[in-house]
Amino acid sequence: MSNHSPNPEIIRNMFSKVAANYDKGNNVLSMGIHHLWRKKLVKYSGAKAGDQVLDCATGTGDLAIEFKKTVGTGAVTGTDFCAEMLIPAPGKAKERGLDITFEQADVTQLQYADNSFDVCSISFGIRNVGDPVKALKEMARVTRPGGKVMVLEFGQVNIPVFGALYNFYSQNILPKIGGIVTGQKEAYEYLQKSSAAFPCREGFLDLMKESGAYSKMEYITLTGGIAYIYKGTVK
């Protein structure tokens, strides 16, 4: 796991190339289940009407949209460090009649004041950050004490037979299909390798502990361990 050390500029360039077909690739490869995972994160966060929410690494805005449906008049801001990924996001929100602010920002250097948000989230982005502990500190900084930092991320399946089947799929089939759908096979090879290497379960909670920013940390398992949702209560 210590070998996983992504280079931010390489990651930014990779996502800029896949951006135009990102949603299509997600829907095909997950059979749409990623939408259910995001809905579960919003519910698990305890977000309520009127809350202020920051979604980091928002990409094309899916999680920001889910939060806005819940918080209503509360403000939702979606950020990403890759400008190309953000291009479809405002249109997707507008189609749904939702008012969401989208801005370019780096999760390790957020431009927002301390204690600005009730909930801060990141989905499928923390493993792409060069210093995830710094990102976890920064997300906590902009979240009020008692607020929640939510992380949705891929991990490793720890169910014997299902794990073997999923590993075969992710190593041998997922990159090929991703390459066909988006024209960027390398991005889906990276997805598989980074998901297999990045800390999950207690390993990720250790990163949260290392940040020193949380009074309580917990997680739930999704789809047998393909992904996990982590929740940290900010000190």
UniProtKB/Swiss-Prot annotation:
Amino acids binding S-adenosyl-L-methionine: T60, D80, D106, V107, S123
Similarity comment text for this entry: Belongs to the class I-like SAM-binding methyltransferase superfamily. MenG/UbiE family.
EC number: 2.1.1.163, 2.1.1.201
Coiled-coil regions listed: none
Gene3D superfamilies for this protein: Vaccinia Virus protein VP39
GO biological process, one term: methylation
Purpose of the protein: Methyltransferase required for the conversion of demethylmenaquinol (DMKH2) to menaquinol (MKH2) and the conversion of 2-polyprenyl-6-methoxy-1,4-benzoquinol (DDMQH2) to 2-polyprenyl-3-methyl-6-methoxy-1,4-benzoquinol (DMQH2).
Gene this protein is translated from: ubiE
Domain of life: Bacteria
PANTHER family with a match to the protein in the record: 2-METHOXY-6-POLYPRENYL-1,4-BENZOQUINOL METHYLASE, MITOCHONDRIAL (PTHR43591:SF24), METHYLTRANSFERASE (PTHR43591)
Protein name, per record: Ubiquinone/menaquinone biosynthesis C-methyltransferase UbiE
Keywords: Menaquinone biosynthesis, Methyltransferase, S-adenosyl-L-methionine, Transferase, Ubiquinone biosynthesis
SUPFAM superfamilies cross-referenced by the UniProt entry: S-adenosyl-L-methionine-dependent methyltransferases
Group of enzyme by EC: transferase
Pfam families assigned to the protein according to its UniProt record, in alphabetical order: Ubie_methyltran
Gene Ontology MF: a single term: demethylmenaquinone methyltransferase activity
Biological or metabolic pathway of the protein: Quinol/quinone metabolism; menaquinone biosynthesis; menaquinol from 1,4-dihydroxy-2-naphthoate: step 2/2; Cofactor biosynthesis; ubiquinone biosynthesis
